[in-house]
Amino acid sequence: MEAIKKKMQAMKLEKDNAIDRAEIAEQKARDANLRAEKSEEEVRALQKKIQQIENELDQVQEQLSAANTKLEEKEKALQTAEGDVAALNRRIQLIEEDLERSEERLKIATAKLEEASQSADESERMRKMLEHRSITDEERMDGLENQLKEARMMAEDADRKYDEVARKLAMVEADLERAEERAETGESKIVELEEELRVVGNNLKSLEVSEEKAQQREEAYEQQIRIMTAKLKEAEARAEFAERSVQKLQKEVDRLEDELVHEKEKYKSISDELDQTFAELTGY
């Protein structure tokens, strides 16, 4: 009887232990199920986040493609502006050459005027000394008149040349205004590209990439942005250089205009002297 009691107690103790182990196993199973459900939720959330990141990266890629297109357009505009600046330089060189030739003709006309004046003085002295030699005096007067006419024709030709130079300068000024407008348009496009790049950079910084492939793609896009930023800085520098070149050309045009005014005044003075000399000669 005592043995049966002991056996029953042992069986009861074993039953209690089994119940405890079963409860522990059930608790572990519940914990495992909770962890499994949590892991599944995390996996679904991670997959959703990766899909969202891929969508955002696709949008960023489209924005980068559009930015590359705008950058190419900007570079083409800058190349056009540089070509215009080179054409302006060539035109100014031609104007300077015309001005040098006109100055040479002015020197010739001035020399002939001096020669005519000297001849007129000599003619006056000869007229007083040789009043009875009218035929000789008339021939000399005719020669002086011909020289004066030739000098006047050269002065008129020089005036026409300077009018042509003035017309060319007006064309240069119009070209300069168009170049300045293109430079201003290029600057506004650069500002727009910088703003777009800033937005792209902020979007990339806000992405929380948890998958290695997405991280690699983000790094590649950031490298493209750095390259585009460097290209934009280079384009800005080229635009600034083009603007400085236009300003320099404008100063050169102003200088040439001043020289034109000065040369026209010299021509007017020579023309007045020719008219006065001719009047004095015809008065005798």
Swiss-Prot record:
Key words, A-Z: Allergen, Coiled coil, Repeat
Coiled coil ranges: 1-284
Keyword Magnesium tagged: no
Pfam families, per database record: Tropomyosin
Keyword Repeat: yes
Domain notes: The molecule is in a coiled coil structure that is formed by 2 polypeptide chains. The sequence exhibits a prominent seven-residues periodicity.
Protein role: Tropomyosin, in association with the troponin complex, plays a central role in the calcium dependent regulation of muscle contraction.
Subunit field text: Homodimer.
Similarity field: Belongs to the tropomyosin family.
Entry protein name: Tropomyosin
Originating organism: Dermatophagoides farinae
